[in-house]
Amino acid sequence: MKSTLLAAVLLASLSAPVPDGRAPEGAERVRAELTIAQLQYDGGGDWYANPSGLPNLLAEIRKRTGLRVAERPVQIRLTDPNLYNYPYLYLTGHGNIRFTPEELQVLRQYLANGGFLHADDNYGLDESFRREMRRVFPDQELVELPADHPVYHAFYEFPDGLPKIHQHDGKPAQGFGLFQEGRLVVFYSYESDLGNGWEDADRYDNPPETREKAFRMGVNLFLYALAQVTP
């Protein structure tokens, strides 16, 4: 399973960032370093939360898979013409998100054309994120993914689904998704706070085994998303 998935990701990383190549007119299509794009948004929420998390995750991806990924993520807005060079978009924060009509249209097109969004609830994100997803896809609702979904078994095994990393309200961790033509385009990690577990070891009081679960799930998400990019 691991070797097959890595082969798919290696092939995908050599191809165009958007699988079917239908980037909108005016969008720049250049060879970009393989990395995670962190979404900047308006509305008052701290999109920049957990600043050491993504660099640490990228380091673990390099170490565990051998993929040549960048040392740091890029920070990007939905209106940036380089958006289509990054098939993995990451969103986090504690507060409110608000997209403009233009951003909604871009995100809808980005996801329909092969992009992947991972939204990581850093506590306090849930209400506004669900609202904005209804604006992106008015005819869809986020659905909870079963524990046998491939994202939980892409590289590491999570037989019980999304791991619980930070306690917050003590609610169980849940993974939700939105689909386009059978493809998972949005993964929403709720009441898990993976980014908390990716942060520097001295930042929070997470034990090593909890941080390990967070990194493993992060590797799964990255590889799963990139394996969907086909030449």
Region spans (language model):
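Sec-dependent N-terminal signal peptides
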Residues: T4-S13
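Aromatic-Pro/Gly-enriched surface loop or interdomain linker
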Residues: P17-Y88, T92-G95, V185, D193-L194, ...
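Short alpha-beta junction capping motif
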Residues: I36, Y88-E127
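An acidic, glycine-rich "communication" segment
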Residues: G44, D126-D202, T210-F215, V219
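Extracytoplasmic/secreted envelope proteins and their assembly/folding machinery
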Residues: P51-L58, L104, R108, D126, ...
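Surface-exposed patches in mature extracellular/periplasmic domains of secreted proteins
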Residues: L67-R77, A119-N122, Q140-D148, P231
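Alpha-helical scaffolding within the catalytic cores
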Residues: E71-L78, T100-V106, G170-Q174
